[in-house]
């Protein structure tokens, strides 16, 4: 256990930041899963409604990833890699149909 006041404060601060970062990462993962699920549905039946859902979910996922990068929860290369994977998933579906 920490002995000094400053070390105790660092423990509290790092725990607070860890929980905040955890919630951001969880939200990013959730939105990515929802987007990939929408892409699968669009691949199964490419209707304009499904395309609109895909576009909406992509926008939400990109936004959350960018905010996580801005707040240094994710490294910018990690954020770029996640966005590239999302774009690639849609590109593969579009080229297949």
Curated annotation (Swiss-Prot):
Q: Name one GO cellular component term.
A: small ribosomal subunit
InterPro entries associated with the record: Ribosomal_bS20 (IPR002583), Ribosomal_bS20_sf (IPR036510)
What top-level branch of life does the organism fall under?
A: Bacteria
Give the start-end ranges of region Disordered: 1-22
Question: Which UniProt keywords are present, listed alphabetically?
Answer: Ribonucleoprotein, Ribosomal protein, RNA-binding, rRNA-binding
Query: Which Pfam family, an example, fits this chain?
Result: Ribosomal_S20p
- Please name the SUPFAM superfamilies in this protein's record: Ribosomal protein S20 (SSF46992)
Q: Which GO terms describe its biological process?
A: translation
List the GO molecular function terms. small ribosomal subunit rRNA binding; structural constituent of ribosome
Q: Describe the family membership recorded for this protein in Swiss-Prot or TrEMBL.
A: Belongs to the bacterial ribosomal protein bS20 family.
What is the recorded function of this protein according to its Swiss-Prot or TrEMBL entry? Binds directly to 16S ribosomal RNA.
What name does this protein carry?
Small ribosomal subunit protein bS20
Instruction: Write down the species.
Output: Crocosphaera subtropica (strain ATCC 51142 / BH68)
